[in-house]
From Swiss-Prot:
Entries under InterPro entries matching the protein: UbiD, UbiD-like_C, UbiD-like_N, UbiD_Rift_dom
Protein name, entry field: 3-octaprenyl-4-hydroxybenzoate carboxy-lyase
NCBIfam families assigned: PRK10922.1, UbiD family decarboxylase
The keyword Membrane is assigned to this record: yes
Organism whose genome encodes this protein: Vibrio vulnificus (strain YJ016)
Gene: ubiD
Pfam family for this entry, one: UbiD
Phylogenetic lineage: Bacteria, Pseudomonadati, Pseudomonadota, Gammaproteobacteria, Vibrionales
UniProt keyword annotation of Membrane present: yes
Amino acid sequence: MSFKDLRDFLNHLEKKGQLKRITHPVDPAYEMTEISDRTLRAGGPALLFENPIGYDIPVLTNLFGTAERVAMGMGREQVKELREVGQWLAYLKEPEPPKGFKDALDKLPVFKQVLNMPVKRLRKAACQEVVWQGEEVDLDKIPVMSCWQDDVAPLLTWGLTITRGPNKKRQNLGIYRQQKIAKNKIIMRWLAHRGGALDLRDWMEKYPGKPFPVSVAFGADPATILGAVTPVPDTLSEYAFAGLLRGSKTEVVKSASNDLEIPVSAEIVLEGYIDPNEYADEGPYGDHTGYYNEKEKHHVFTITHITMRKEPIYHSTYTGRPPDEPAVLGVALNEVFVPILQKQFPEIEDFYLPPEGCSYRMAVVTMKKQYPGHAKRVMMGVWSFLRQFMYTKYVVVCDESVNARDWDDVVKAMTENMNPILDSLFIESTPIDSLDFASPVAGLGSKMGLDATIKWEAELALQGATTSTEFASQIGFDVNALKAVHPLISDIYVPGVASGQFMVVKINKTHAGQCKEVVESLWQVESVKQRNKFIVVCDDDVKADDWHDIIWAITTRMDPARDTLKIDGSKSCSAKLVFDATNKYSEEITREWGKPIKKDPKLVAKVDALWQEFGIL
């Protein structure tokens, strides 16, 4: 099923009980975030705040707050059907000619869909019924959300930023967060490898100092929105892909003030330019990691025109500790990634980006292993094949029999099949998300690969081992006794599947270096010395038996190379890795550490008192 615009999609969701209209007045400053966060974590509906305090424009949040709604937006009934979308993209990335008449017939549905890819250009559009220009331009009239108490300013989040590089026919659509700094200015935070930033770079090289035209569309139809967050091939425009998803051509209209084409289905459009010489400090903001990011300088977008429908809807979201809407999108798009990766690496059985790993910082891959060292080839492939994974810090590779989406199964494979030292790969000074405060410097850090596949004879020979589980003897293992080994230990969790070879240790850290102090005390215990392979050390704010908490701590509080302690094995001691997933003190790091997002107790109490009245769940 396809949808011509956002309102068509909302009507469909409402009929299915997947949209809740909130008529009670709600403040876009913080209150909408608290309500949206509770709703998303409960798997609840999209929310339409019809009476935002101080504004006449309703606010839509949590539109893609479940993977099922993402699938609906892509014209699918079930999340598993998104693999078909991935198959299309894999085909478009590397098309193969038909091998015969039957194969041509099999490919016919794809060819028919491809015919819907070119855009349809219109002269008029509802998104230009109202036009503000010059002094009329005023972002203060739009209910831009303030999400967290320590955010520096209101934040625009769901705009489709439309750019075109010089001498390029294809436009680029991207979604970048945008800090409001004046009634006609926002900061455009885009990473250097993203399409909009690349278009600006090319423009600055060809037209030094000249304004770079930009348009930003809010509230387009779901296929166009989701097309902007999907890994489409570089040769394919997001508008064309949206047409493929929708089954009909994407309708566009020329911007009121520049030559960029905007989606006819949009609710609100910002138009203007970026002065290549104008920068401003962006942030800090509470981000999808669950922390506030550092300040960074980014280009300023000056708005000369705002166009909109009559009685428009403002589409917004928040980001915070997962799960949030970006994490949910990651879960759904995970199904799109699988066929694309399998096209290049047919040996891959499954691929999983756990949402607790901030959508992309950790990947688990299962594969049909075919030769010694095969797992390392797959690791390299994940890091290099799609630019979406250039910031992935951890890649765990397991055999096809392992359930990539079950942490107990993955940990069991790690403990049974790995020599922690020899089967781990570290690569330093690689591209890392600039929001990753655990990296030594902004944008540059390390990656880690873990080969948890069953080892072949050649691999064991190289390791000088006869089995990969030689230290898994049945020596007594008393968790309560281990807790008493060091006064900083507050809890220890040993997964039942790990036979004592994997443990999570919670400590009450008060100064630098205490992780090493604790594990060195544990290593003096004979059972730990001989049997244990992996220890994860976390702070007291992490639940030791909750994999979501554990993986979140590992992916946000570690630089793999710096924060992994290594012990080579010997006849009396098993090889060991310690993941120091604690918050770091200034003596342990070289840059400012992230500040965790914390909710305002007064705001929580206020929403508690009104919760039943909202009737959301």
